[in-house]
């Protein structure tokens, strides 16, 4: 979500369409460093252990913008090893690392920390160590477009604090194994805040303890696997109200934490859209993936983020995206963008997580597309496809959607609108809405609470659609040019072929004779093939460019 918000923020500043601004500011060839590799590469010093449990215990000194605490790492060894890597930004101090009650030697390189054990940890062994740390965390200049802490005022003279760290990584504020491929199985999050304030984090509140130093500790337990950037603190003088939804897996708790002055507005806005969203997404994607942890919306001083079971909300109770329809069709103003989009990530992003940041299209393309599925559930398929088509004006084709692997880099912001249009095309090609819904639900079942690769997702869709879509995905995800359908009319016959980067590109496309019904043709790259459509002539030849994001060229 951060990339989309970044694009939209710059657009707001320059009063032009967001994705165009992104191209102008960020276009260029990037060079990667040793620090990028340490952050993005799953080296043997990271793959040697499988993280099972964290207990993050942190105290937030708001006045001094200072944090201190510890994180317990409980893990299982996947191989024999005596050294491992965890991650913590170098502006934060590692006070000590303890193993069996004794300090461990450690060294730091950029934002990586390496520890040496006194003996070999054997494969299959379960062990734990604790990292004690402190410091002034990075303060985000404009969260969630950049990562870190947000220290704000709630408008009533009280502090309002939040974290947001997608892409830059959770190690910007707490020590962890900061690689998307390894999600912790469960986690206890203990947050001490000044008396009179509340911390609202992921999962369920287990305990509130008044300490003797002017602080109150809130213990939140997350019972499901969670990606590191999905772990969040939200601190304010929150007011709470709740509801329930009887969904596909029974009763789901709905909890809302908002600023006091916004309670009435929140009751209306959340009441209008949350249950509608959950009903639509359970229909399309299957049961909400985190029933045991519940569903929360938490008002934040930044726009929003898909923090698992605790969605950050900052859309100011307006329809659309802060009052705007990103598709310019009108359909985007019939719902709250942050509620729908960020909650869509509970299925694609939190339930299914990409192993590498390079494959973030798995999160963002599907969640962009989820917006249209929400529209379809309530307003019909035509409205949904109009919305998808309307988002095309945001496509830049500036760089590939899939980024280089192993350097913690995400690809083009086109993963939102171009990715959504790609998925709509795949659906049209499958030409079986029941099957398409089965595929979407099946993805969330087959990869339930898992980290995945692009290959796994594409292979699943191809297998269940009974059509190999690998070349279609490759063209749209790995190249900046879109395929062009070239056609010609000669001696009373129509001919067509694809011009594409991918050799053997073989996407079916819908065409028709004006006034007739659409039919699929199956052009290839290379030589022209005959288009067998009775009565077709240059003056009545039409291609379904409403649903197919392609170029057209007459020879």
Model region roles, listed by residue range:
Residues 25, 84, 89-152, 213-214, ...:
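A surface-exposed beta-strand-loop module
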Residues 70-91, 175-179, 184-194, 455, ...:
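Surface-exposed beta-strand/loop patches in extracellular or lumenal glycoproteins
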Residues 223, 360, 364-425, 447:
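Acidic/His/Gly-enriched intrinsically disordered linker/tail segments
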Residues 93-99, 200, 469-470, 489-546:
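Beta-strand-rich binding/interaction modules
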